[in-house]
Protein backbone atom coordinates (compact mmCIF):
# COMPACT_ATOMS: atom_id res chain seq x y z
CA UNK A 1 0.00 0.00 0.00
CA UNK A 2 1.51 3.35 -1.02
CA UNK A 3 2.18 6.04 1.60
CA UNK A 4 0.20 9.24 2.12
CA UNK A 5 1.07 12.42 0.21
CA UNK A 6 0.45 14.75 3.12
CA UNK A 7 2.07 14.57 6.54
CA UNK A 8 -0.34 13.89 9.37
CA UNK A 9 -0.08 13.87 13.12
CA UNK A 10 0.17 16.29 16.02
CA UNK A 11 3.22 18.21 14.81
CA UNK A 12 2.53 18.19 11.06
CA UNK A 13 1.08 21.75 11.00
CA UNK A 14 4.33 23.51 10.07
CA UNK A 15 5.05 21.14 7.21
CA UNK A 16 1.48 21.45 5.90
CA UNK A 17 1.75 25.24 6.05
CA UNK A 18 5.03 25.21 4.09
CA UNK A 19 3.56 22.85 1.49
CA UNK A 20 0.49 25.03 1.02
CA UNK A 21 2.65 28.16 0.68
CA UNK A 22 4.73 26.50 -2.03
CA UNK A 23 1.91 24.96 -4.05
CA UNK A 24 -0.19 28.16 -3.96
CA UNK A 25 2.05 29.41 -6.78
CA UNK A 26 0.59 26.80 -9.13
CA UNK A 27 -2.75 28.63 -8.90
CA UNK A 28 -2.77 31.08 -11.84
CA UNK A 29 -5.12 33.61 -10.17
CA UNK A 30 -2.95 33.74 -7.02
CA UNK A 31 0.19 34.14 -9.12
CA UNK A 32 -1.32 36.99 -11.19
CA UNK A 33 -2.43 38.79 -8.04
CA UNK A 34 0.85 38.43 -6.16
CA UNK A 35 3.07 39.44 -9.08
CA UNK A 36 0.72 42.29 -10.10
CA UNK A 37 0.55 41.01 -13.68
CA UNK A 38 -2.91 42.44 -14.38
CA UNK A 39 -1.83 46.02 -13.60
CA UNK A 40 1.53 45.52 -15.30
CA UNK A 41 0.08 44.62 -18.70
CA UNK A 42 -3.24 46.48 -18.47
CA UNK A 43 -3.50 49.42 -20.93
CA UNK A 44 -5.62 51.31 -18.35
CA UNK A 45 -2.94 50.67 -15.67
CA UNK A 46 -5.50 49.44 -13.13
CA UNK A 47 -7.83 52.44 -13.52
CA UNK A 48 -11.57 51.86 -14.14
CA UNK A 49 -11.72 54.25 -17.12
CA UNK A 50 -9.37 56.10 -19.46
CA UNK A 51 -9.43 59.06 -21.82
CA UNK A 52 -8.26 58.71 -25.40
CA UNK A 53 -8.30 60.13 -28.90
CA UNK A 54 -10.06 58.28 -31.74
CA UNK A 55 -7.58 57.35 -34.47
CA UNK A 56 -9.90 55.48 -36.85
CA UNK A 57 -13.19 53.63 -37.12
CA UNK A 58 -12.90 49.89 -37.66
CA UNK A 59 -15.29 47.01 -38.25
CA UNK A 60 -14.55 43.81 -36.36
CA UNK A 61 -16.10 40.61 -37.71
CA UNK A 62 -18.12 38.66 -35.15
CA UNK A 63 -17.10 35.14 -34.19
CA UNK A 64 -19.01 32.07 -35.36
CA UNK A 65 -21.89 31.28 -35.48
CA UNK A 66 -22.78 34.99 -35.84
CA UNK A 67 -22.23 36.90 -39.06
CA UNK A 68 -21.93 40.63 -38.39
CA UNK A 69 -19.50 43.52 -38.44
CA UNK A 70 -19.22 44.98 -34.94
CA UNK A 71 -18.53 48.71 -35.02
CA UNK A 72 -15.39 49.65 -33.11
CA UNK A 73 -12.86 52.48 -32.90
CA UNK A 74 -9.09 52.50 -32.46
CA UNK A 75 -8.27 54.75 -29.51
CA UNK A 76 -4.91 56.13 -28.42
CA UNK A 77 -4.87 56.59 -24.65
CA UNK A 78 -3.74 59.98 -23.36
CA UNK A 79 -2.04 58.66 -20.20
CA UNK A 80 0.44 56.28 -21.87
CA UNK A 81 0.04 56.48 -25.65
CA UNK A 82 -1.10 52.86 -25.99
CA UNK A 83 -3.52 52.09 -28.81
CA UNK A 84 -6.55 49.88 -28.03
CA UNK A 85 -9.70 48.83 -29.86
CA UNK A 86 -12.97 49.86 -28.19
CA UNK A 87 -16.47 48.66 -29.05
CA UNK A 88 -19.12 51.29 -29.82
CA UNK A 89 -22.43 50.14 -28.28
CA UNK A 90 -25.97 51.14 -29.35
CA UNK A 91 -27.40 51.01 -32.86
CA UNK A 92 -25.96 53.63 -35.22
CA UNK A 93 -23.93 55.39 -32.54
CA UNK A 94 -20.74 55.15 -34.63
CA UNK A 95 -22.21 58.08 -36.59
CA UNK A 96 -21.77 60.30 -33.51
CA UNK A 97 -18.05 59.55 -33.26
CA UNK A 98 -15.52 61.14 -35.59
CA UNK A 99 -11.75 60.83 -35.87
CA UNK A 100 -9.84 63.00 -33.37
CA UNK A 101 -12.80 63.01 -30.97
CA UNK A 102 -12.00 62.61 -27.28
CA UNK A 103 -13.62 59.50 -25.81
CA UNK A 104 -13.79 57.85 -22.40
CA UNK A 105 -13.47 54.06 -22.46
CA UNK A 106 -14.06 51.40 -19.83
CA UNK A 107 -13.68 47.63 -19.65
CA UNK A 108 -16.31 45.71 -21.59
CA UNK A 109 -16.90 43.23 -18.73
CA UNK A 110 -15.90 39.91 -20.26
CA UNK A 111 -14.81 36.85 -18.26
CA UNK A 112 -11.43 37.28 -16.50
CA UNK A 113 -10.98 40.74 -18.03
CA UNK A 114 -11.11 39.35 -21.55
CA UNK A 115 -13.29 40.14 -24.58
CA UNK A 116 -17.05 39.75 -24.36
CA UNK A 117 -19.34 37.59 -26.47
CA UNK A 118 -18.63 37.34 -30.18
CA UNK A 119 -16.26 40.33 -30.50
CA UNK A 120 -12.73 38.91 -30.73
CA UNK A 121 -9.87 40.88 -29.17
CA UNK A 122 -11.96 43.85 -28.03
CA UNK A 123 -11.75 44.43 -24.27
CA UNK A 124 -13.08 47.99 -23.97
CA UNK A 125 -16.20 49.99 -24.83
CA UNK A 126 -16.86 53.69 -25.42
CA UNK A 127 -19.05 55.43 -22.82
CA UNK A 128 -18.48 59.15 -23.48
CA UNK A 129 -17.73 61.29 -26.53
CA UNK A 130 -16.28 64.78 -26.00
CA UNK A 131 -17.38 64.70 -22.36
CA UNK A 132 -21.01 63.75 -23.06
CA UNK A 133 -22.50 60.31 -22.47
CA UNK A 134 -22.86 58.31 -25.69
CA UNK A 135 -26.20 57.01 -24.44
CA UNK A 136 -27.52 60.60 -23.95
CA UNK A 137 -26.43 61.57 -27.49
CA UNK A 138 -28.00 58.42 -28.92
CA UNK A 139 -31.29 59.05 -27.08
CA UNK A 140 -31.38 62.67 -28.30
CA UNK A 141 -31.25 64.08 -24.76
CA UNK A 142 -27.99 65.97 -25.37
CA UNK A 143 -26.04 67.23 -28.35
CA UNK A 144 -22.47 66.26 -29.01
CA UNK A 145 -20.24 69.30 -28.45
CA UNK A 146 -17.81 70.23 -31.20
CA UNK A 147 -14.20 70.48 -30.15
Swiss-Prot record:
Record's keyword annotation contains Transcription = no
A GO MF term: structural constituent of ribosome
The entry's function note states: With S4 and S5 plays an important role in translational accuracy. Located at the interface of the 30S and 50S subunits.
Instruction: Quote the protein name from its UniProt record.
Output: Small ribosomal subunit protein uS12
Matching Gene3D superfamilies: Nucleic acid-binding proteins
Q: Which family does it belong to?
A: Belongs to the universal ribosomal protein uS12 family.
Q: Name one GO biological process term.
A: translation
One Gene Ontology CC term in the entry:
small ribosomal subunit
Q: What is the lineage of its organism?
A: Archaea, Thermoproteota, Thermoprotei, Thermoproteales, Thermoproteaceae
Does Glycoprotein count among this protein's keywords? no
Q: Which UniProt keywords apply?
A: Ribonucleoprotein, Ribosomal protein, RNA-binding, rRNA-binding
Query: Which NCBIfam families would you find in this protein's record?
Result: PRK04211.1 (NF003254), uS12_E_A (TIGR00982)
Q: Which Pfam family is one of those matched by this entry?
A: Ribosom_S12_S23
Amino acid sequence: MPGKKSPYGLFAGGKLKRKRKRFKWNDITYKRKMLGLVEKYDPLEGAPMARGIVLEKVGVEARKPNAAVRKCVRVQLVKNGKVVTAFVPLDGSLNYINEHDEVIIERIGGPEGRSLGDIPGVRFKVIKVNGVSLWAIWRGKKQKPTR
